[in-house]
Design a protein with these regions (language model features):
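C-terminal and inter-domain tail/linker signature
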Residues: 1-122
Length: 122
């Protein structure tokens, strides 16, 4: 795996381990992360603080990480009690830290497929 991809994978692995200090070393001080589904933006240490404050009972699985130079994409599954969330995250990594990112979150099974697509599904 590339160095930049390893930074993102390691960040999520440290989050899963609740190694908050270790995870924080992988985030740039001027970090900004955007959540598209809510329009929220987290700057600096607020991103890690928000994750740390999230109610316990969750687990993270890094499904896939793809890197092309400083750009890294990650598919991550988060299970919290009986709900599964998916994150498709796209990050910029420089000098061994995540500098920015956009995360697209969905809740598995939370939406019914539209009727018009039924003829195309198996």
């Amino acid at each position: 795996m590339s160095e930049t991809g390893s930074v993102v994978r390691t960040f999520f692995e440290r989050m899963e381990a609740r190694d908050w200090d270790g995870a924080g070393t992988l985030l740039a001080p001027d970090l900004h992360i955007e959540f598209t589904e809510t329009g929220e933006r987290f700057d600096g240490g607020n991103f890690l603080a928000m994750n740390r404050a999230y109610p316990e009972g969750w687990s993270i699985e890094v499904v896939e990480v793809l890197a092309a130079g400083p750009r890294v994409a990650a598919q991550v599954r988060v299970i919290h009690r009986d709900v599964t969330f998916w994150c498709a995250g796209f990050y910029d990594v420089q000098d061994g830290t995540i500098r920015s990112g956009v995360e697209h979150w969905v809740t598995e099974g939370s939406e019914s497929p539209p009727v018009w697509r039924r003829p195309f599904t198996t």
